[in-house]
């Protein structure tokens, strides 16, 4: 009998929490933002978590998702820039590398290496995103070491 009452109380408490999350618009938005963050749609997650914080400034889930989305977007942008720079370097190297092109390549390498150092690492960030950013940096370090 006591066991049944304990189970009923536990289910009731879980239902209350679920009702709270479902009825509070700020937490509803925060849950959607968390879903988009986990789906690697960082811009949508950022927008939704910002809306959730606008509704309730004390929503910790939304604040965490907002901060993590900002960091993830910086990592994604770094990776995207790295790919674009590598494409430009490949195009430059197909026609022969002039002294000016050599300086541009060196500058691109320096920018990518320095930008990596400015990225804010977090334990909550996706490991795949962090490792891809690190490998992008390593490509530019290797390229710089081999060429200069």
Language-model features, listed with the residues they occupy:
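Alpha-helical linker/edge segments of TPR/alpha-solenoid repeat scaffolds
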Residues: 68-95, 140-148
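Canonical positions in the second alpha-helix
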Residues: 51-52
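Alpha-helical tetratricopeptide repeat
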Residues: 23-37
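Hydrophobic membrane-insertion alpha-helices, especially the h-region
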Residues: 4-22
């Amino acid at each position: 009998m006591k066991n049944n009452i304990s189970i009923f109380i536990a289910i009731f408490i879980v239902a209350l929490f679920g009702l709270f999350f479902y009825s509070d618009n700020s937490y509803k938005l925060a849950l959607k933002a968390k879903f988009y963050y986990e789906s690697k749609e960082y811009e949508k997650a950022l927008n939704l978590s910002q809306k959730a914080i606008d509704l309730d400034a004390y929503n910790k889930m939304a604040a965490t998702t907002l901060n993590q989305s900002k960091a993830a977007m910086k990592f994604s942008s770094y990776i995207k820039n790295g790919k674009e720079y590598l494409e430009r370097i490949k195009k430059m190297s197909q026609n022969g590398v002039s002294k000016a092109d050599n300086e541009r390549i060196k500058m691109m390498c320096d920018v990518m290496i320095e930008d990596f150092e400015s990225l804010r690492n977090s334990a909550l960030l996706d490991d795949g995103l962090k490792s891809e950013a690190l490998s992008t940096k390593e490509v530019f370090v290797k390229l710089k070491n081999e060429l200069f």
